[in-house]
């Protein structure tokens, strides 16, 4: 029987995929075949001609490839998987079955999501620049308990939190020590990709500080956005300072770190308008947000220390990181099952498209200037040499 025959192709691929992703072993071969049938090309598997490995590597490490991904392509009035994502999966399947792609190479560059039944590129976060900034080795390492979640198709917060208990504990302890040395008032910013766990760790930090009798407040960066109509008219990207009432933002951070009460813009997320005009003045009828002085002030946002001009004002800069496969499983549970937030195929396209782009423009740059990185998947706390020296003395 030809390896391209549907039954034989599925049999060989199933065997190899169980080694690439242990969760495949929880599927019966016929269930695997059901899922695979959705990706069979019109001309059959023999019609797929795999590209050279070096060409694929170059493609998936080029931002232009991700810019070209469509998140809402339609066929017969329904959203379908982007053709580039589909073709990548088909080539990897065929390359595995024929032996043109060895399992180690596929595992190194890609991960397979069972629930979405597609391949995604593994995003590299710890670049040479980041590693040099952090002194080349973790400050502390623990058992990698997220490995216990490899066979899960989706992950809830309870099991995620349990897997991260040790590294979260040392993070909280380390931040408390840094605050004791650097003093208050202090700005604390936690950045990280979607579903990495940053919202939950911030809530836990806040609770710890309040239990210790410290006054805590927060500044939400999105409140400094200018009107969306203006940004769209000017083609302004929302990650840049041009999208913000930046002078107000900078002055607000300066003032609150000196114990002053601040009045900041209020952004209306329904109408996408700011309480302030482009000159930073309160509009007629606008209502600002008043923030009282505090010991610890969280900056809420995805890129709190991406803006070079305010980095020096942020007393503690943390990146909370979780690898893409775990984050994707968290989002299946949180955003699809619980929140019913996305149409599933739209979600697959969007997650595939966004991770490389966001790592390149937001997270790796922040990792290169932060004080600490929590790698929950690697179960390690990374710090700069300066911070490591402080923590060793306290």
Locate the predicted segments by residue:
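Post-Walker A alpha-helix
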Residues: 201-202, 206
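ATP-dependent NMP and nucleoside kinases share a basic, alpha-helical "lid"
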Residues: 282-337
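P-loop (Walker A) phosphate-binding loop of NTP-binding proteins
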Residues: 193
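Conserved lysine of the Walker
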Residues: 198
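Long, basic/Gly/Ser/Thr-rich N-terminal segments
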Residues: 1-160
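Small-molecule kinase domains that catalyze NTP-dependent phosphoryl transfer to phosphate-bearing small molecules
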Residues: 75, 79-100, 104-109, 339-386
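Conserved nucleotide-sensing/catalytic segment adjacent to the nucleotide-binding pocket
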Residues: 217-279
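N-terminal pre-Walker A segment at the start of P-loop NTPase domains
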Residues: 153-179
């Amino acid at each position: 029987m030809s390896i391209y025959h549907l039954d034989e192709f599925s049999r060989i691929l199933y065997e190899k995929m169980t080694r690439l992703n242990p969760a495949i072993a929880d599927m019966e071969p016929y269930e695997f075949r059901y899922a695979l049938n959705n990706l069979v090309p019109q001309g059959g598997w023999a019609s797929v001609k795999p590209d050279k490995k070096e060409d694929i590597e170059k493609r998936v490490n080029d931002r232009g490839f991700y810019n070209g991904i469509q998140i809402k392509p339609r066929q017969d009035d329904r959203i379908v998987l982007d053709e580039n994502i589909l073709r990548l999966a088909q080539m990897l399947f065929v390359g595995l079955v024929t032996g043109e792609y060895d399992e180690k190479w596929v595992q190194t560059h890609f991960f397979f999501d069972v629930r979405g039944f597609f391949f995604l590129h593994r995003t590299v976060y710890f670049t040479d620049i980041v590693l040099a900034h952090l002194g080349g080795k973790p400050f502390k390492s623990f058992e990698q308990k997220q490995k216990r979640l490899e066979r899960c198709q989706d992950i809830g917060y309870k099991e995620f939190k349990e897997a991260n208990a040790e590294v979260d504990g040392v993070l909280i302890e380390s931040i408390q020590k840094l605050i004791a040395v650097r003093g208050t008032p202090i700005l604390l910013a936690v950045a990280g990709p979607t579903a990495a766990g940053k919202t939950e760790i911030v809530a836990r930090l806040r609770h710890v500080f309040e239990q210790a009798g410290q006054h805590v407040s927060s500044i939400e960066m999105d409140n400094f956005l200018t009107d969306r109509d203006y940004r769209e008219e000017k083609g302004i990207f929302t990650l840049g300072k041009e999208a913000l009432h930046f002078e107000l933002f900078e002055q607000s951070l300066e003032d609150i770190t000196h114990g002053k009460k601040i009045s900041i813009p209020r952004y209306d997320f329904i109408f996408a308008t700011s309480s302030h005009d482009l000159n930073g003045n309160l509009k007629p009828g606008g209502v600002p947000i008043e923030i009282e002085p505090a010991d610890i002030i969280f900056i809420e946002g995805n890129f709190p220390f991406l803006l070079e001009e305010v980095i020096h004002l942020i007393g503690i800069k943390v990146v909370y990181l979780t690898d893409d496969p775990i984050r994707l499983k968290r989002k299946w549970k949180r955003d699809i099952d619980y929140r019913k937030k996305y149409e599933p195929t739209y979600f697959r396209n969007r997650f595939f498209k966004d991770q490389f782009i966001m790592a390149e423009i937001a997270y790796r740059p922040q990792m290169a200037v932060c004080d600490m990185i929590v790698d929950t998947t690697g179960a390690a706390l990374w710090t700069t040499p300066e911070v490591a020296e402080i923590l060793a003395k306290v």
